[in-house]
């Protein structure tokens, strides 16, 4: 019997329909529960612990590699290269637990099946730059003291006895015993993330009893059940898309919620778990708030609504977890609190107008094992802060001007850079990215064209047609306070498609060093482009605790920088 907290200082939640199952799809009305961990939370020092549900995500969501949502599990009808490599055979999982708090709390982590967790000296919390007090508990677990924080806390708890070593031969992951293999990352086999969130302000929680609110009932969601009210409210419980677009039932993974034009707000209450995706059609400002979960676990990779949700890739139409295809202009998307699990493609895109901006905070993305699972778009004048992105594509997409991102934690898989500013020539300015913690990366091979394996990157094009536009520039772009943990890939791999002016990278730390082996992912590269300016300043960059300077930056030295000689005198390291 679970025991949860529901007070002004602490709120936790639980699902009685938790299903421990790491091999197949869970029942539609169930939630996959961590088979490894139990999480409890107490007001600090009170020693009165309340249950906090530990969710779990697994690669391919137990469906296997399938093309159509009605295909038999593990029938291998889907594309061979979906971004998932050794994860299933290695038993990789990702668990998370979330709660709301307003004071110091103690988070207790217990093994699920009676084992003992290691003593605190064999526990690492990432980002490591933020220190936590860890002590053993008398019942075989550990207790982590989490201080109050108006921005919340997000961290990974990692145990020395449960790590997986990713090794690559430069083409693919290989066994650690392979003599041609080199370590590219060491990560948890069974990850555990803790999301300690501040309570939402009143203006981010709609009234459940308001006349313009549609309150959903936990269970199956059939065609048009979501109605036409202004607010769509999901109370605690489990929900799933149960019909196809024609209304036939049961049909799993064959529909999403295309909201009525009057509906502008989706609220996911703490404890709401919605298996589906959201498409807005409103011309007003629109919202997604609440500490519930929106999960794409029922969708196949690259699910395309235009082909009955089969996995036919379309950059424009494959399913987004948050989408809008008919913007009216002058709109803002307010997103505060949700967790996104198992996206089947890009997580968020809005179309129809360039006059769109976002305000995103306390946003979490987990279980992003498929390719194309990127971070949210940063539209013009966007402000994003206090986010956690698990991604297997571009994490931070900087395609528009006057955008700010602050306090981001990134767990990167093996596709595309962490920070992306390429694909086509751009004319943008006034970008600020600061306080970025990259806690894991695991690039398989050295790539420069299309999908550069690097922290800061600019892909030259999507179709192999490299274009340079000397009438455009990326100007006044600052990356500040960037930390990459573990053995890191290159700082930058940029194919210039336009000028770079007043581009500043400052206060960068790679405490565990750069990759140095023949896989060659540690080398930064900037090839020549005729007539392009490359005015870039790197300030206070350390690798393994040693400062990179103009005396030790070269490809065979500490910085491993290979910048074409044509740019000499335009860029600097100090």
Q: Can you describe what each PLM-predicted range is?
A:
Residues 1-254, 275, 293-314, 544-574:
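Extracellular "leader-to-stem" segments immediately downstream of a signal peptide or signal-anchor
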Residues 133-137, 244-250, 268-270, 337-338, ...:
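Short, solvent-exposed secondary-structure boundary motifs
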Residues 153-155, 230, 262-264, 284, ...:
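Core residues of folded domains in eukaryotic genome-function proteins
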Residues 158, 235, 289, 322-323, ...:
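Residues in well-ordered beta-strands of folded domains
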Residues 233-235, 265-269, 287-289, 334, ...:
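Residues within well-ordered beta-strands of beta-sheet-rich folds
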Residues 236-237, 253, 263, 271, ...:
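Glycine-centered loop/turn motifs
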Residues 254-272, 278-294:
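Beta-solenoid repeat scaffold
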Residues 276-279, 285, 294-332, 337-569:
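Glycine- and acidic/polar-rich repeat regions and solenoidal domains
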């Amino acid at each position: 019997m679970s025991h949860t907290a529901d007070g002004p200082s602490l709120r936790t939640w639980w699902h009685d329909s938790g299903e421990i199952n790491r091999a197949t799809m869970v029942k539609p009305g169930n939630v996959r529960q961590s088979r490894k961990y139990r999480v409890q939370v107490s007001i600090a020092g009170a020693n009165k612990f309340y249950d906090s549900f530990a969710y779990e995500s697994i690669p391919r969501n137990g469906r296997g590699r399938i093309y159509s949502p009605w295909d038999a599990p593990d029938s291998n009808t889907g594309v061979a290269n979906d971004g998932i490599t050794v994860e299933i055979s290695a038993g990789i999982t990702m668990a998370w637990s979330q709660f709301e708090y307003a004071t110091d709390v103690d988070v207790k982590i217990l093994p699920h099946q009676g084992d003992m967790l290691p003593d605190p000296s064999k526990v690492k919390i990432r980002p490591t730059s933020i220190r936590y007090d860890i002590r053993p508990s008398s019942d075989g677990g550990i207790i982590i003291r989490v201080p109050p924080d108006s921005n919340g806390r997000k961290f990974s708890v990692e145990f020395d006895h449960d790590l997986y070593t990713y090794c690559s031969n430069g083409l693919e992951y290989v066994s650690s015993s392979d003599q041609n293999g080199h370590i590219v990352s060491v990560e948890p086999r069974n990850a555990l993330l803790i999301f300690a969130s501040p309570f939402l302000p009143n203006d981010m929680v709609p009234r459940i009893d308001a006349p313009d609110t549609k309150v959903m009932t936990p269970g199956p969601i059939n065609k048009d059940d979501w109605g036409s009210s202004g607010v769509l409210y999901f109370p605690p419980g489990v929900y799933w898309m149960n019909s196809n677009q024609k209304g036939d039932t049961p049909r799993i993974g064959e529909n999403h919620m295309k909201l009525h034009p009057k509906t502008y707000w989706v609220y996911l209450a703490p404890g709401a778990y919605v298996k589906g995706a959201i498409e807005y059609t409103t011309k007003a400002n629109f919202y997604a708030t609440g500490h519930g979960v929106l999960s794409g676990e029922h969708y196949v990779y690259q699910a395309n609504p235009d082909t009955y949700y089969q996995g036919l890739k379309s950059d424009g139409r494959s399913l987004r977890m948050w989408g809008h295809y008919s913007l009216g202009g002058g709109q803002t998307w307010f997103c505060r609190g949700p967790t996104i699990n198992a996206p089947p493609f890009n997580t968020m895109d809005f179309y129809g107008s360039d006059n769109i901006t976002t305000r995103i905070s306390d946003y979490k993305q987990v279980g992003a094992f498929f390719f194309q699972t990127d971070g949210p778009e940063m539209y013009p004048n966007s402000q994003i802060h206090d986010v956690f992105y698990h991604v297997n594509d571009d994490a931070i997409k900087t395609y528009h001007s006057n955008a700010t991102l602050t306090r981001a934690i990134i767990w990167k898989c093996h596709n595309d850079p962490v920070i992306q500013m390429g694909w086509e020539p751009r004319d943008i300015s006034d970008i600020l990215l600061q306080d970025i913690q990259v806690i894991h990366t695991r690039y398989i091979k050295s790539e420069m064209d299309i999908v550069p394996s690097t922290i800061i990157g600019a892909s030259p094009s999507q179709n192999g047609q490299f274009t340079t536009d000397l009438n455009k520039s990326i100007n006044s772009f600052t990356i500040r306070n960037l930390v990459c943990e573990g053995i890191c890939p290159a700082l930058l791999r940029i194919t210039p498609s336009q000028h770079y002016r007043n581009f500043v990278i400052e206060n960068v730390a790679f405490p565990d060093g750069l990759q140095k082996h023949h896989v060659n992912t540690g080398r930064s590269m900037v090839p020549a482009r005729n007539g392009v300016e490359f005015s870039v300043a790197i300030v206070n960059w350390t690798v393994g605790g040693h400062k990179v300077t103009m005396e030790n930056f070269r490809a065979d030295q500490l910085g491993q920088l290979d910048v074409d000689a044509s740019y000499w005198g335009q860029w600097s390291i100090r």
